[in-house]
From Swiss-Prot:
PANTHER family attached to this UniProt entry: INNER MEMBRANE ABC TRANSPORTER PERMEASE PROTEIN YDCV
Protein name in the entry: Putative 2-aminoethylphosphonate transport system permease protein PhnV
Similarity annotation: Belongs to the binding-protein-dependent transport system permease family.
GO biological process: transmembrane transport
Isomerase is among the record's keywords: no
Organism: Salmonella typhi
Membrane topology: Multi-pass membrane protein
Amino acid sequence: MLIWSPKGRAAAGVVASVLFIVFFFLPLAVILMSSLSQRWNGILPSGFTLNHFVNALHGAAWDALLASLTIGFCASLFALLCGVWAALALRQYGVKTQKWLSMVFYLPSAIPSVSVGLGILVAFSQGPLQMNGTLWIVLTAHFVLISAFTFSNVSTGLARISADIENVASSLGASPWYRLRHVTLPLLMPWMVSELALSLSLSMGELGATVMIYPPGWTTLPVAIFSLTDRGNIADGAALTIVLVAITLLLMMKLERIAKRLG
């Protein structure tokens, strides 16, 4: 503990609680109240209704939910596959080479998502790899944005697996493929599932790049929320935000529970 005195720890706890309430709880509470409000002309809503949630689960909003889940799972699974492959491949190199190659994987996380979206839009709007107006361009953008986090988490998991375990399997005659399937991947599985949860949450909430490249029929929840609030439909946008937060949290909790069970 950096704070040794009981009074100091109590004060730090109070400050942390106040900051949590002000910057996390209150905004969500306001969004929830807005999603349930009939009219909000004063300090508090003057009436409550569930119509905004009904709107959030029908029509274009429901299509946006399905699109977000489809894009999120597809991009996250592909990023996980590539992240595991890259992390395993980098183990064959020296420390200095690993450092420089890791920087290449971390680079997308340092670039604003709007810049990533613009770059992908320009790169894949013409030529043999034209993807503009298709689902593939959205999947590409989401993959680029979450791949760095996937690689980082999987690399951390690999670093915590003792090399002695694989060496013992090798000394017993296990082939590299057998070691990978029956030793390395099972030990890495909790990290992989945990990373899948993180990637899915990042993809579900992505807006900056998606709003520049999404094709008709593949409007995601963040884009739908932005469109609703931009048109002044705050209540429906708030209801859709609550749906997005709830589904993302439920998926993360389920995947984290699976990860703990595997661990």
